[in-house]
């Protein structure tokens, strides 16, 4: 079975399912989204700018915690509707958690908005800078209290090598909490591969990787903890699958990366 380990909710849902069919992908793990670039009339800067501006505000951490929390409640409902409409295609999802809450309020949020919905992980987390990456520590602690739910953390720009190393330190201090290094660390992919190699609870996400070389090296170093993902609508399922099949060192690794690994991680 081929499972995309990260797709954001796309509208209409029927179009998202059609993309899975085109790529020969059986299932996808869903993540929430605030912007919807797939709704732009054309792929021009003019049409896509408004949706991408929302994304850049999130990545830049310019929203206060209250505003972001309020947004998350609505997009969780949007994701829940997609899962209910196609339970055989979207069998699992990660629930968003605001960064910047203290531990008791983070725990309360996870109980109310993640566990109640049956979501299997926490994220995507998008630290706006290296300092905000430290807030992941609280989430990791809460994860330990709530069944060791995996964390999915964005490690591409604006996160730097320093932020990635901070996340590696958090993985070391919480060895029983799976931490997915989203987008493979971007430009700092070599550091990220080394961290994942040295921490058995760390995982390497192959969506939006820096280059085919980074995918090839990751699958050679940590084939059992690499995850096929598209980050759709920002990535394309057909192209993302082809990247894995082209750069994988063996058919056995290809099978693991395209599905077996995420099945084992999320127990789906």
Where does each model-flagged region fall?
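Active-site neighborhood of phospho(di)ester-bond hydrolases with catalytic His/Asp-centered motifs
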Residues: 2-5, 29-32, 94-95, 123, ...
């Amino acid at each position: 079975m081929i499972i995309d380990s990260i797709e954001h909710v796309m509208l209409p849902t029927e179009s998202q399912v059609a993309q899975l069919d085109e790529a020969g992908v059986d299932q996808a793990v869903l993540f929430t989204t605030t912007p919807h670039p797939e709704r732009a009339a054309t792929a021009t800067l003019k049409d896509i700018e408004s949706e991408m501006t929302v994304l850049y505000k999130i990545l830049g951490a310019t929203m206060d915690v209250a505003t972001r929390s309020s947004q998350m409640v609505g997009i969780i409902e949007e994701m829940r509707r997609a899962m209910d409409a196609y339970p055989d295609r979207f069998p699992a999802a990660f629930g968003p958690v605001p960064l910047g809450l203290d531990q008791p309020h983070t725990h309360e949020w996870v109980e109310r908005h993640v566990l109640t919905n049956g979501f299997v992980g926490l994220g995507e987390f998008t630290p706006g800078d290296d300092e905000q990456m430290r807030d992941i520590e609280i989430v990791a602690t809460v994860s330990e209290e709530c069944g060791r739910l995996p964390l999915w953390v964005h490690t591409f720009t604006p996160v730097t090598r320093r932020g990635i190393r901070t996340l590696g330190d958090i993985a070391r201090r919480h060895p029983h909490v799976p931490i997915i290094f989203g987008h493979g660390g971007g430009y700092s992919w070599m550091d990220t591969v080394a961290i994942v190699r040295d921490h058995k609870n760390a995982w390497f996400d192959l969506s939006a990787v820096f280059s085919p070389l980074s995918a090839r090296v990751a699958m050679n170093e940590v084939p059992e903890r690499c995850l096929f993902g598209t980050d759709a609508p920002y990535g394309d399922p057909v192209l993302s699958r082809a990247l894995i099949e082209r750069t994988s060192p063996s058919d056995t690794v290809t099978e693991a990366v395209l599905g077996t690994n995420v099945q084992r991680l999320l127990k789906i």
